[in-house]
């Protein structure tokens, strides 16, 4: 991931006091729905439009003196997503990766959390009442995990948006590793490399 190096969680936790830690979570749920009655949705994946106009995942900076990374992440989820985030808890078992950048000295920890479709829908419905809605978070969006017949609409077009940090790469890695796309469809994606 450009400008960032991957590191093990244990290494990230021992970087020292000059480093800040940010935790974010990809929330997803199986979705049996069909777009236009024929295109399988397969999964619902949430991202958010941030205050700076970029797409990212819910979460934010955490202070290790206040507890674990997960404690901080769950606090951030409550602030950004509202009461429905209290129906689940992101745990260490949901951890995926850590990446460090040197300027600024920030370690980005990434988690994925499987929810039920009902839980995910409750998050979407309650988010406009969350403390940070309209401030840090401008709204939630579902990632289209399909490609339309033109080969551009759907996920390829979505990936042309502007993402914060390495959120685009985290999304692609998670979608592939979790098997959220139809088998073989990831290899057929026409994805441009970001500038």
UniProtKB/Swiss-Prot annotation:
One of its GO terms (molecular function) is snoRNA binding. It catalyses: a 5'-end (N(7)-methyl 5'-triphosphoguanosine)-ribonucleoside in mRNA + H2O = N(7)-methyl-GDP + a 5'-end phospho-ribonucleoside in mRNA + 2 H(+); IDP + H2O = IMP + phosphate + H(+); dIDP + H2O = dIMP + phosphate + H(+); a 5'-end NAD(+)-phospho-ribonucleoside in mRNA + H2O = a 5'-end phospho-ribonucleoside in mRNA + NAD(+) + H(+). Substrate binds at residues 24, 50, 57, 166, 170. Mn(2+) 2 binds at residue 76. GO terms for cellular component: cytoplasm; nucleolus; nucleoplasm; nucleus. It comes from the Eukaryota. Binds 3 or 4 divalent metal cations. Acts specifically on U8 snoRNA with magnesium as cofactor. Has broad substrate specificity with bound manganese or cobalt (in vitro). Its cofactor is Mg(2+); Mn(2+); Co(2+). A motif (Nudix box) lies at residues 61-82. Pfam families: Nudt16-like (PF22327). GO terms for biological process: dITP catabolic process; mRNA catabolic process; NAD-cap decapping; negative regulation of rRNA processing; positive regulation of cell cycle process; sno(s)RNA catabolic process. Mn(2+) 1 binds at residues 59, 80. Residues 18-168 form the Nudix hydrolase domain. Homodimer. PANTHER family: NUDIX T16 FAMILY MEMBER, U8 SNORNA-DECAPPING ENZYME. Belongs to the Nudix hydrolase family. NUDT16 subfamily. This is U8 snoRNA-decapping enzyme. It comes from Bos taurus.
């Amino acid at each position: 991931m450009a400008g960032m190096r991957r590191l093990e969680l244990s290494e990230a936790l021992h970087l020292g006091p000059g480093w800040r830690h940010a935790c974010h979570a990809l929330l997803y749920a199986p979705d049996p729905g069909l777009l236009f009655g024929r295109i399988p949705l397969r999964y619902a994946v949430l991202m958010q439009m941030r205050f700076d106009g970029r797409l990212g995942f819910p979460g934010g900076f955490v202070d290790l003196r206040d507890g674990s990374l997960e404690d901080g992440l769950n606090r951030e989820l409550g602030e950004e997503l509202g009461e429905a985030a209290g129906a689940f808890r992101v745990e260490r078992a949901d951890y995926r990766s850590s990446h460090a950048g040197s300027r600024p000295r920030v370690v980005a920890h990434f988690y994925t959390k499987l929810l039920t479709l009902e839980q995910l829908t409750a998050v979407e419905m309650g988010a406009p009442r969350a403390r940070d809605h309209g401030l840090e978070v401008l709204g939630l969006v579902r990632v289209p995990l399909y490609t339309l017949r033109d080969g551009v609409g759907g996920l390829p077009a979505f990936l042309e948006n502007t993402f914060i940090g390495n959120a685009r790469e985290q999304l692609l890695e998670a979608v592939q590793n979790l098997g959220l796309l139809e088998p073989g469809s990831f290899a057929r994606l026409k994805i441009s490399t970001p500038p």
